[in-house]
Structures are given as structure tokens and as C-alpha cells.
Amino acid sequence: MMNQPWFHVPKPNAKARLRLFCLSYAGGSSATYLPFAEHLPNEVELVAVQLPGRGMRLAESPYTDLTQLVEDLAAQMKPHLNLPYAILGHSFGSRLGFELVQYFRHQQWPLPVHFFASGSRAPHYKNTDSPIHQLPQAAFIEKLRSFGGTPEEVLNNEDFMEMLLPMLRADFTMVENHQSEMKPALSCDLTILGGQHDGGVPLEDLHDWQLHFDGAVSHVIFDGGHFFIETHKSLVIKAVATKLASILTAELATC
């Protein structure tokens, strides 16, 4: 059984032939991906990763060091790489997923059969926006409001925001300090998901994810902004489910 603090598995599946590990954006949680479970192929088991500092782990200290997070999360994931698997990450989750796969390769662990990079500039691009993680509270909240991913009722709830701020600042610390070096391409197929109106992720920078993979590459662009994974969730689910179904047919038919 999976280590429950780290993994939310809405539909455990002992007969699964493929696992999908899902990683959320900065400030997000496993809840983003739970609706996916009802619409994926029957032979796919969805594993939504829940990091410390949010959801049921709200009382735990969040990570501010991406390298340490990768090492600790990788250790939790290792026993569950016994099936072919894919990784889906949105925004910060894409970069976290990429660093996990780099770590797996270094450790000579099984690599994913597919990687979904969603709503993120390619990992060799460093964040060029003015850092926000150390802003005074009011200014920090205003920046969050400008991003559009946090409900207004949450931003206006002072008590709730007091609980969330350590996690939010920690996530943005990792986001704003991350830049991956160019390394040999990963032997893995890639799907790039993006928002046509995502002002923070130019499509050219999004498509440059393909520089980091040497497998087949496909692109799906949605008519949304940065948080298209929330605003266009049904379409994202359909795109992911279709790709996973093709993987099961093409790559796992003889398993």
C-alpha cells in the first residue's frame, strides 16, 4: 500500500498496467488531479502527490530546497516504480517532475514511458520575474491575486491565508530559484500542454521542453491562461486519457 501522507490514490487498482504520478503547481495540492481518476483508462492507476504544508499535511513544514524535496519524494516513489508509469506536472509540478526523472536516471531507476509537461517554460529557463517569496504579506497576496489561480474568497480570508502563507512562500522559493542545466536528452516520449493566453509562459519557451527528450513529442494547446488545468479541466483530462490509452495499446500490449 502506498505511503498515504505522500500519495493520494482515489481509485486503487491492483490490476493496473500503468501508473500516472501527478504533481501540482506552486500552492496547489493533490485535489487538482482527483477528478482525473474517473476518466482515465481502467488499467491506469492515478497517484496524486501531496507535498507537506497543504491539504491533510497542512501542519507539516513545507520544503524550500528543491534538491532535498526531489531526494525525499524519489525515495517514497521508488517502491511504486514497479509498473510502467507516466508523470504529469503543471507549472512548478512540471519542473519538479523533470528533476525527479533526472534523479531516477542518475540512480539507474526505471524511467517513465511518458512525461506530460504542462504550463511551464522549459526547465533550462530561469525565472526572470521579480522574486515574490520574500515580499511583505500584503504585497505577496496581491501578486497571488494577479496570477489568478487562488480563489478570491481564499485570498480574503485572513485566518486561512495565515495558514497557507508558509507553504506558498516555500513553493515560490523553489520556483524562483530553479534552473536546470542542459543535460543529455531523456529517453522518454513527451506531451507538452499549454495555454494559448498564458502570459507567463510564451509558447516558444513552452515548446522548448522538446530539447530535453529524445522520444516522440506531441503538443496540445488550450484556449486558456496559465491555470487552464483548472479552467479547462475536462479538456485536459480528455487529452491525458487519450494519450494514456494509446500508450497502453502501443507499448504495453505484450506486457
Language-model features: where?
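Domain-scale detector for complete catalytic domains at protein termini or as standalone homologs
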Residues: 1-88, 95-255
